[in-house]
UniProtKB/Swiss-Prot annotation:
PROSITE patterns: TK_CELLULAR_TYPE
Keyword hit for Cytoplasm: yes
Protein name as catalogued: Thymidine kinase
Family membership: Belongs to the thymidine kinase family.
Broad enzyme group: transferase
Organism: Shigella dysenteriae serotype 1 (strain Sd197)
Binding-site residues for ATP, renumbered to this chain: 9-16, 87-90
Biological process (GO), any one: DNA biosynthetic process
Alphabetical list of InterPro entries matching this protein: P-loop_NTPase, Thymidine_kinase, Thymidine_kinase_CS
SUPFAM superfamilies xrefs: Glucocorticoid receptor-like (DNA-binding domain) (SSF57716), P-loop containing nucleoside triphosphate hydrolases (SSF52540)
Example of a GO cellular component annotation carried by this entry: cytosol
Localization annotation: Cytoplasm
Length: 205
C-alpha cells in the first residue's frame, strides 16, 4: 500500500539532497518519478530542485492554483508513475495536501513531501500543518545549532544581520537570510537582537 510521507526539518538539513537521493533510488530500479517544487522559490532557477552539494533534477512547478491530483492522474494515465516527490511542501495549500493524500489513496502512488515545519516566527506553515495531520509517516531530518544542540527553529535576519520575527511569512532567501538554531538560542537571539552576540557569548562560556 502506498503512503504519504512528510520529511520535515529546519533550514539546511539536506531536505533537497534527501529528495533527490530518493528519486534516484526509484529510477535506478527502472521506476518513474515525478518531482514537484514551489514556483515561488526560484533561488536555483525555475523548474528544478537543487541541493547545496550540487545535485539537481528537473521539476514541475506548483503554485496555489495547481490541481495536483488532476495533473498527476492525467500523467499517470499516459505513463505509469511509481513515486511523486514534492520539495518546499510547506507552500502547499490545505486542498493540495488533501489532493496528495488522494494520489496515495486513489491512485496507490507513494508521495514523499519535503519541507520546513515552522516559519521564522515559530508558526506552522499551512502545508506543514496538514501534512503533520494527515501523513502516514512523519520523519524528522535533523540539523544542528551552532551550540551542537538539535536546531528546530529558523531565525530570519535583516540586511544588517539582525534577527527579527515580524513581517511577511514568505521571503525567499538562503543562508544569508535564515539561520537554523535551537529553541534556546532562537529566543535569546531575538531578546538580544543579535545572533552574533549570542554566538560570541557561547564561545566564551
Amino acid at each position: 500500500m502506498a503512503q504519504l510521507y512528510f520529511y520535515y526539518s529546519a533550514m539546511n538539513a539536506g531536505k533537497s539532497t534527501a529528495l533527490l537521493q530518493s528519486s534516484y533510488n526509484y529510477q535506478e530500479r527502472g521506476m518513474r518519478t515525478v518531482v514537484y517544487t514551489a514556483e515561488i522559490d526560484d533561488r536555483f532557477g525555475a523548474g528544478k530542485v537543487s541541493s547545496r552539494i550540487g545535485l539537481s533534477s528537473p521539476a514541475k512547478l506548483f503554485n496555489q492554483n495547481s490541481s495536483l491530483f488532476a495533473e498527476i492522474r492525467a500523467e499517470h494515465e499516459q505513463q505509469a508513475i511509481h513515486c511523486v516527490l514534492v520539495d518546499e511542501c510547506q507552500f502547499l495549500t490545505r486542498q493540495q495536501v488533501y489532493e496528495l493524500s488522494e494520489v496515495v489513496d486513489q491512485l496507490d502512488i507513494p508521495v514523499l513531501c519535503y519541507g520546513l515545519r515552522t516559519d521564522f516566527r515559530g508558526e506552522l506553515f499551512i502545508g506543514s500543518q496538514y501534512l503533520l495531520a494527515w501523513s502516514d509517516k512523519l520523519v524528522e531530518l535533523k540539523t544542528i545549532c551552532f551550540c551542537g544542540r538539535k536546531a528546530s527553529m529558523v531565525l530570519r535576519l535583516d540586511q544588517a544581520g539582525r534577527p527579527y520575527n515580524e513581517g511577511e511569512q514568505v521571503v525567499i532567501g538562503g543562508n544569508e537570510r535564515y539561520v537554523s538554531v535551537c529553541r534556546k538560542h532562537y529566543k535569546e537571539a531575538l531578546e538580544v537582537g543579535s545572533l552574533t552576540a549570542i554566538q560570541e557569548r557561547h564561545r566564551h562560556d
